A protein has these predicted regions:
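Substrate-binding cleft of extracellular glycoside hydrolase catalytic domains
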Residues: 62-75, 92-177, 183-185
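Extracellular/periplasmic catalytic domains that process cell-envelope and extracellular macromolecules
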Residues: 59-61, 82-85, 113-114, 143-146, ...
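Residue-level detector of anion-binding/catalytic polar loops
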Residues: 87, 117, 189
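Catalytic domains of cell-wall/extracellular-matrix polysaccharide-remodeling enzymes
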Residues: 149-226
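Bacterial N-terminal signal peptides that target proteins for export
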Residues: 13-37
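C-terminal motif of bacterial Sec signal peptides marking the signal peptidase cleavage site
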Residues: 47-48
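Functionally critical loop-and-helix segments that line ligand-binding/catalytic clefts
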Residues: 55-70, 199, 207-272
C-alpha cells in the first residue's frame, strides 16, 4: 500500500490573504485527529482527515528514484548520476531482432563501475517473432547475476515498417514466450513496461506475478486509473539529472527504501 502522501499531509501552506498555519497549530490538529478521547473514536478521526484533500503523491514523495536511458543521452557521467539521488537505471539494449543501442555496452559498464544498480531493456517489435527477439537480446545483453531484472518495453508506436495494432489474442502468447525465455536464461522474472492504455487494452489480467512499470506523464497512475496495479512510474521524459546533458526519462519505485532493498534481493512480491 502506498503511504507516500503522508509526508505531505501537514505541510504548511500559505493561502491568499491569510497567514500560514504554524507548526503548533498543526500539531494540535494532528493530536485531535488521532486521539480517540478527543474525537470519540478512530473512525471519527479518519473522517476528519478526509476533509483535507491534499491530492495524490507526486514523484518527489517517493524515496527511490531512477532513470532509463538510451543512446539519445549520449555520453553519461555515471558517478554524477549516482550523486544526484539516483537509485537505479535501465539501459536500452535492443529493439526487435536486428537493432542494438550503440551506447549500451558503454552504459552497462559505466553504471556498474559507479556502483549503480542497472538493468537492460528490450523494445518490442510487433512484426518479429518472439524467439527472434529473445535471441537478439541474449546476443547483446551479458548474463550478470547482480543486474536488475530485464525489462520488456511494449507499447504502440507509429511504424512505417510495422503498421497496425495486433489484437490481444495475438500479442499475449508472443509476449509470454519472450518473458518466459528471458527468465529462464537470466534467472530473474522480467518487468513489463507499458502505457496505461496499452496495459488496459492488451495486457490487463494476463501476467499476474510480474512487476509493472507504467509510463504516465499526465498524472499519477492511480488517479488516471484507480484499479491499476503498478510498481514503477515513469513520470516524465523531460527530467534533468546531473551527469546527463539534456533531458532524460525519470522514474520512481512504488515503495519504501526497505521494500526497494527487498526488490534488489528478489524478495518482494509484485502483487503486494
Amino acid at each position: 500500500m502506498d503511504f507516500a502522501w503522508v509526508k505531505t499531509a501537514f505541510r504548511t501552506k500559505r493561502r491568499r490573504g491569510r497567514k500560514p498555519i504554524g507548526v503548533g497549530r498543526w500539531a494540535s490538529l494532528a493530536a485531535r485527529l488521532v486521539n480517540p478521547l478527543a474525537l470519540g473514536s478512530l473512525a471519527v478521526g479518519l473522517s476528519a482527515c478526509a476533509l483535507f484533500d491534499f491530492g495524490p503523491p507526486g514523484p518527489d514523495d517517493y524515496p527511490v528514484k531512477g532513470i532509463d536511458v538510451s543512446y539519445y543521452q549520449d555520453d553519461i557521467n555515471w558517478r554524477s548520476v549516482v550523486a544526484d539521488n539516483t537509485a537505479f537505471a535501465w539501459l536500452k539494449a535492443t529493439e526487435g531482432g536486428d537493432w542494438s543501442d550503440p551506447k549500451f555496452a558503454q552504459n552497462w559498464h559505466g553504471a556498474a563501475m559507479a556502483g549503480l544498480p542497472r538493468g537492460a531493456y528490450h523494445f518490442w517489435y510487433f512484426c518479429r517473432p518472439a524467439m527472434e527477439q529473445v535471441s537478439w537480446f541474449l546476443q547483446n545483453v551479458p548474463y550478470d547475476p547482480y543486474a536488475l531484472p530485464p525489462v520488456l518495453d511494449i507499447e504502440w508506436v507509429d511504424s512505417k515498417t510495422c503498421p497496425g495494432h495486433p489484437p490481444r489474442e495475438a500479442i499475449i502468447p508472443e509476449v509470454k514466450t519472450w518473458l518466459e525465455a528471458i527468465e529462464r536464461y537470466y534467472g530473474k522474472r522480467p518487468i513489463i513496461y507499458t502505457s496505461i492504455s496499452f496495459y488496459n487494452d492488451r495486457l490487463r489480467g494476463a501476467f499476474p506475478g510480474y512487476f509493472v512499470w507504467i509510463a504516465s506523464y499526465k498524472g499519477h497512475p492511480v488517479v488516471r486509473d484507480p484499479s491499476l496495479r503498478w510498481n514503477f512510474w515513469q513520470h516524465t521524459e523531460a527530467g534533468r539529472v546531473a551527469g546527463i546533458r539534456g533531458r532524460v526519462d525519470r522514474n520512481v519505485f512504488n515503495g519504501s527504501t526497505r521494500e526497494w532493498q527487498a526488490f534488489l534481493e528478489g524478495r518482494l512480491n509484485p502483487d503486494g
